[in-house]
Each structure stands twice: as C-alpha cells, then as structure tokens.
C-alpha cells in the first residue's frame, strides 16, 4: 500500500511540474522572425540608456488584431554607482489572433520637439 501511495505522489509531482506555463519568448535579433502561438506573450529586448534621456518608443500603430502591447520595463546592466550606465529595455507583447505583423521601435534622443529617431528596429511577428 505504501508503494502505491508513493507512486501516486511521484506521478502527481511529475505531472504538476509538466503543467507549468512556458515562459515568454525573448527576442533580441530583428533579423529573426518571432513565431508564437495565439494567446502567448513574447518580449523584445533592446539595449538602452535612459539616464542619458534617450528612450525607445513604438513607432506607428500596432496591428491590434494580431498583437497587443502589454508593458515596458527597464533593467540596469551596469554598476548602480555608475552614472550614465546602460541596461536593457524589455518590451512585452501578447499575441491575439493568427496572422503576421511588424513591430517597429524607435530610439529617440532627449527632446521636447518631435524628431526622427536616432535608430529604428523592426521585428516580424508570426502568430500561429
């Protein structure tokens, strides 16, 4: 009887470990298309240095029928005591329906006037 209970416990632990949700796909290379399933999140990670006033923004309109913006976070990758140290801008999106679209981000200088971005990067997103 103890062996059966132990076996049931081990199988339950194994199944619980397998049932977890897969982590969001993390992408840094715009040359590689992002392929995700419907309802899944993915992140685009870009080098950034907001301490200098530069910042990333979504350019144009997202195709809300295919992907939606979820959130934007920043993580420092430099010594916290270093003024002007950079880090990573982490953009999270969620796929909504099957389709293909593009997400374009622009890196803008510090300014109150509308200006062209210093850099742009475009990611192709394929939702299956």
How does the language model describe each region?
Residues 15-17:
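C-terminal motif of bacterial Sec signal peptides marking the signal peptidase cleavage site
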Residues 125-127:
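Interdomain boundary/hinge segments at the C-termini of tandem beta-sandwich modules
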């Amino acid at each position: 009887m103890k062996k059966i209970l132990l076996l049931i416990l081990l199988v339950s632990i194994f199944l619980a470990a397998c049932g977890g949700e897969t982590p969001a796909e993390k992408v840094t290379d715009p040359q590689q298309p992002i392929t995700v399933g419907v309802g899944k999140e993915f992140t685009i990670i870009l080098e950034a240095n907001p301490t200098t006033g530069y910042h990333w923004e979504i350019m144009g309109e997202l195709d809300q029928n295919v992907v939606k913006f979820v959130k934007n976070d920043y993580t420092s990758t430099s010594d916290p005591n270093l003024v002007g140290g950079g880090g990573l801008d982490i953009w999270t999106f969620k796929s909504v329906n099957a389709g293909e679209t593009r997400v374009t981000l622009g890196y803008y200088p510090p300014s109150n006037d509308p200006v062209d971005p210093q850099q742009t990067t475009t990611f192709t997103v394929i939702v299956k």
